[in-house]
UniProtKB/Swiss-Prot annotation:
Organism taxonomic ancestry: Eukaryota, Fungi, Dikarya, Ascomycota, Taphrinomycotina
Name by which UniProt lists this protein: Fimbrin
GO terms (BP aspect): actin cortical patch localization; actin cortical patch organization; actin filament bundle assembly; actin filament network formation; actomyosin contractile ring organization; endocytosis; formin-nucleated actin cable organization
Domain EF-hand: 16-50, 51-86
Residues that bind Ca(2+) 1: 29, 31, 35, 40
This protein's GO CC annotations: actin body; actin cortical patch; actin filament; actin filament bundle; cell division site; cytoplasm; medial cortex; mitotic actomyosin contractile ring, distal actin filament layer
Taxonomic source organism: Schizosaccharomyces pombe (strain 972 / ATCC 24843) (Fission yeast)
One protein family per Pfam: CH
Length: 614
């Protein structure tokens, strides 16, 4: 019966071919489920020499296997038919792979060398991992990597490699007996990936969701992977980790001015510091054209390790050959990573940046400071710094441009604040009244910046914010307390607007309403913990927020993993677990476990408000 149906659907196939295929399918379907998973299907066609990994993968897409990913007998024959005709899916030109998009009129391009180098990095850092170690090394020459990412485990592990403890891995759904996770469990893991990446800082998540990862959308996954790797590399370029970075200050530059520089600029400063020390006349201002001939790299490596890395590559006239010699020198320092000769010559900015950052992280080559030289860094304002970190992530999540890396400094001209108002309540801002940033890229004149900030304060007053004593000049001058007060009320308005749009009665929620909701969720889960306000000291153990999550989705909270929170370490374990569970639910959480344990009321409110919005 099935053979007749298939013969009608695929008249171009012989009866013998159809019978052979159905017989092959039945042998592969050892459990008699009536379907195969995609990895089994791909391997079957690869083993029988019917097509390469990428060809079979594209054929599966062409026969429109449903969202479950299950390949039924009819699909299996259809895949063979597509392979027999020839697959048109990808095209490679000069190291760039063009792939079909979601519709026939859309295509996307990915860089072949970037894919290869990022996969090599992942294979290296995940080797021996108890959960995914058996899945590496992943083939660097096929699209298998994107399929391996679908269940979120590889990406979760990569996030924790870049920024340790971002994800509490106890909340992840993991394979058992090598059986692939179902789509629902994959989406839960991918929620953790997306929402954790949003909270890492320095990562833009505006066009990728959990479903895109599940569907294996290559250009989106590769873009996310690059940002995660980049975040890990640049996160170590920090004066608190490397006080010797103080040596890079230029004449008449203050430490405060230096600390405002984004990490990429500090890397370029570091590169040029060594070139100058080597009496080399050239400088670098980018990670593309200025390094493409390999000369500056040759001098940098020689300066970092003269006994191992000579300047001999400068005598080589062929740039590709010189690039290879540069990387051979880097190999002597155990730093041949991310970059290839062709990527260097092509001036690939991502791979060059990764190479230089890795070089800095392993061989900074800066003399340690003695006691007299150590700079006086402002005392750490825990409350203010924690809030500034969360507010930075929140503002960046609104897709403001340029993105913020130095909270107080980046808000001084008022433009980001005004963009945020317009994102929260569209058409609030009359842009004709706003002073634009100079086209030259220079800093806006102070009086114009103050005018913008005055406008931002006025808009806040119109929204009923409490801004007594706050003027635009306070924002322009970088007043920490007053800037935080304004941005907090903007974020609070954003939370209440979101909840207002979701509530049936359309009621604007007060803090006490949110506290009551949290208490009701904790009670619903059968737990007795309650709080009086977002300042309640009992929040510090982390147990209350877990009880709230248990009330929302009881199966997500395993109380065997919950401690009494009696010590700071145990409380942080609880808080970290709660944050990852919230992200698994789909909540966008920007705070750190320490914010819950320290009972920072504004940040606890953000946590509860984000749960209410799920």
């Amino acid at each position: 019966m099935l053979a007749l149906k298939l013969q009608k659907k695929y008249p171009e196939l012989t009866n013998e071919e159809i019978l052979t295929l159905t017989d092959q399918f039945n042998k592969l379907d050892v459990d008699g489920k009536g379907y195969l998973d995609q990895p089994t299907t791909i391997k079957a066609f690869e083993d029988s020499k019917k097509g390469s990994y990428d060809e079979v993968r594209e054929a599966i897409r062409e026969v429109n296997v449903d969202s479950s990913g299950r390949v039924e007998p009819e699909d299996f024959v259809g895949i063979f038919n597509v392979l027999k005709k020839g697959v048109e899916g990808t095209e490679v030109k000069k190291g760039r792979i063009t792939i079909k998009g979601s519709s026939s009129s859309v295509s996307h391009t990915i860089n072949e060398e970037e894919r290869r180098e990022f996969i090599k990095h992942i294979n290296s850092v995940l080797a021996g991992d108890p959960d995914v170690g058996s899945r590496v090394p992943i083939n660097t020459e096929t699209f298998e990597f994107f399929d391996q990412c679908k269940d979120g485990l590889i990406l979760s592990k990569l996030i924790n490699d870049s920024v340790p403890d971002t994800i509490d891995e106890r909340v992840l759904n993991k394979q058992r007996n090598n059986k692939p996770l179902d789509n629902f469990k994959c989406i839960e893991n991918n929620n953790v990936v997306i929402n954790s990446a949003k909270a890492m800082g320095g990562i833009s998540i505006t066009n990728i969701g959990a479903g895109d990862i599940l569907e294996g959308r290559e250009h989106l996954i590769l873009g996310l992977v690059w940002q995660i790797i980049r975040r890990g590399l640049l996160g170590k370029i920090d004066i608190t980790l490397h006080p010797e970075l103080y040596r890079l200050l230029e004449e008449d530059e203050t430490l405060d001015q230096f600390l405002r520089l984004p990490p990429e600029k500090i890397l370029l400063r570091w590169f040029n510091y060594h070139l100058k020390a080597a009496n080399w006349p050239r400088t670098v201002s980018n990670f593309s054209k200025d390094v493409s001939d390999g000369e500056n790299y040759t001098v940098l490596l020689n300066q970092l390790a003269p006994e191992l890395c000579s300047r001999a590559p400068l005598q080589t006239t062929d740039v590709l050959q010189r690039a290879e010699q540069v990387l051979q020198n880097a190999e002597k320092l155990d730093c041949r990573k991310y970059l290839t000769p062709t990527a260097m010559v092509a001036g690939n900015p991502k791979l060059n940046l990764a190479f230089v950052a890795h070089l800095f992280n392993t061989h900074p080559g800066l003399e340690p400071l003695n006691e007299e030289e150590k700079p006086e860094i402002e005392p750490f304002d825990a409350e203010g710094e924690r809030e500034a970190r969360v507010f930075t992530l929140w503002l960046n999540s609104l897709d403001v441009t340029p993105s913020i890396h130095d909270f107080f400094n980046n808000l001084r001209d008022g433009l980001i604040l005004l963009q945020a108002y317009d994102k929260i309540t569209p058409n609030t801002v009359n842009w004709k009244k706003v002073n634009k940033a100079p086209a030259s890229g220079d800093e806006m004149m102070r009086f114009k910046a103050v005018e913008n900030c005055n406008y931002a304060v006025d808009l806040g007053k119109n929204q009923g914010f409490s801004l007594v004593g706050i003027q635009g000049a306070d924002i322009t001058d970088g007043s920490r307390t007053l800037t935080l007060a304004l941005v907090w009320q903007m974020m609070r308005m954003n939370i209440t607007k979101t909840l207002h749009s979701l509530s049936r009665g359309g009621k604007t929620l007060s803090d006490s309403d949110m506290v009551a909701w949290a208490n009701s969720m904790a009670a619903k889960g059968g737990k007795g913990s309650q709080i009086r306000s977002f300042r309640d000291p009992s929040i510090s153990t982390g147990v209350f927020v877990l009880d709230v999550l248990h009330g929302i989705k009881s199966e997500y909270v395993d109380y065997n993993l919950v401690t009494d929170g009696s010590t700071e370490e145990l409380a942080i374990q609880n808080a970290r677990l709660a944050i990852s569970i919230a992200r698994k639910l789909g909540a966008v959480i920007f705070i750190l476990p320490e914010d819950i344990v320290a009972v920072r009321p504004r940040l606890v409110l953000h946590f509860i408000g984000s749960l209410m919005a799920v």
